[in-house]
């Protein structure tokens, strides 16, 4: 596996450490040890040492959201996101990207959002409003909870705050960190 020495050092430093185990939101949501920075780093170190194949850890690596909770709470200063991002690049370069990730990226590139959805017409009035104040709600709210967005705009208006809503809200920086997207 072709990752930097820095990434290898971080993976080796994290693989037997339990310090951030309770921090990972994915690990907490799934209740699975495999969804922690420690388990991911152990998998990476096994691939680096030739004890397992890259394809064996691909799904696990892509289950990391790159939220940075592990990094922000690391008392020793390591940044597991470094090896996760580099390994994601390796997975793509080796043609081992999980099918669900390829589908997600294709949907995003084709439609501009990960849902492949159109914006609800119930927000047309909010999009037409011009204001010095912009409201950024993100794509989850825009596509999955448009009525909540409409209610938030109405609430702000009642409070005397006129807001402009932009249709072109990105789903965040996470997708832009995908090597295949860059």
Residue ranges of model-derived segments:
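N-terminal structured subdomain of primase-like DNA metabolism proteins
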Residues: 1-9, 19-22, 26
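Iron-sulfur-cluster electron-transfer modules
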Residues: 2-4, 8-11, 41-182
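A broadly conserved sequence feature marking short terminus-proximal activation segments
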Residues: 16-44
